[in-house]
């Protein structure tokens, strides 16, 4: 029969001990390491009981106080409902809003509907790692950005004080699409001789204006006022006014001459039009460019360049010819960081573009 515990020790929970000087210690049964708890018996017993529950429950146990407090907390999924309304109030384009919604849907699938303050960096990192492991680093990067923005809005409304996304690593997505050089442009342009006449004109206009294919297809003659082509970019909503006196010296392209040819040869309501003088879709333009690229006989490392690469080529040529700031304005980018993604060689006011 074991030695009877003293009166002071008789009612203590397992792993809690009292020293002769009345000081309480908790001994971790896994390691034998002791932790001091002070001389307050009631507090020491409460701490020891909670520690025993945490160590031996076999699952993540949430303290009663945390459960009580969480009744007044906003959960992640309910906050995402609120975040969707915040996005809608920003006045962003429908296409951009749809892209946000797809990321929010992925977040709902990947994270529990727990109180915002209980969502951990570890849980977020695990979700993002799942995408990276599947070779979807670009998706992981976009989801992380959306989730971080959602938590920033929650902080702004006072629901939480820290952003658990901030400590996660941003996924590095490798862009595999090849850049297009000026010489390669000329070879594809030459190969496009057998294509419909509008393809060459679309290529010229893409390089001299630096705009996306979707915006090129939407350009109308009525958008030209007092020597400026007014473009509201469909992707970002950025409004820019491009001087029709622009020219790309490296390729011998004059915007005025290209516009004159479009009016004389195509003669549609839109600047780029089909042989029937009807508007063209971005898919049609991109598809015919792909055919001309294949006909050129050029080979590329990585994914071959699409029509979109003419925008990057434009930025790089204007950077050399005029300045990087000019290229940034022309592309409609808000930050130097984003503009540099297009300028590198890969190895609700109108912004009036001025040639300086």
Swiss-Prot record:
Residues 175-355 form the Tyr recombinase domain. InterPro entries: CB, DNA-bd_dom_sf, DNA_brk_join_enz, Integrase-like_cat_sf, Integrase_catalytic, Integrase_lambda-typ_DNA-bd_N, Integrase_recombinase_N, Phage_int_M. The keyword Ribonucleoprotein does not apply. Residues 74-155 form the Core-binding (CB) domain. One of its GO terms (molecular function) is transferase activity. The keyword Plastid does not apply. The active site is at residues 212, 235, 308, 311, 333, 342. Keywords: DNA integration, DNA recombination, DNA-binding, Hydrolase, Transferase, Viral genome integration, Virus entry into host cell. Its EC number is 2.7.7.-, 3.1.-.-. One of its GO terms (biological process) is symbiont entry into host cell. Integrase is necessary for integration of the phage into the host genome by site-specific recombination. In conjunction with excisionase, integrase is also necessary for excision of the prophage from the host genome. Bacteriophage 434 is a lysogenic phage that shares extensive DNA homology with bacteriophage lambda. It inserts its DNA into the E.coli chromosome at or near the lambda insertion site. Complementation of integration functions between the two phages has been demonstrated. Belongs to the 'phage' integrase family. This is Integrase. The lineage of its organism: Viruses, Duplodnaviria, Heunggongvirae, Uroviricota, Caudoviricetes.
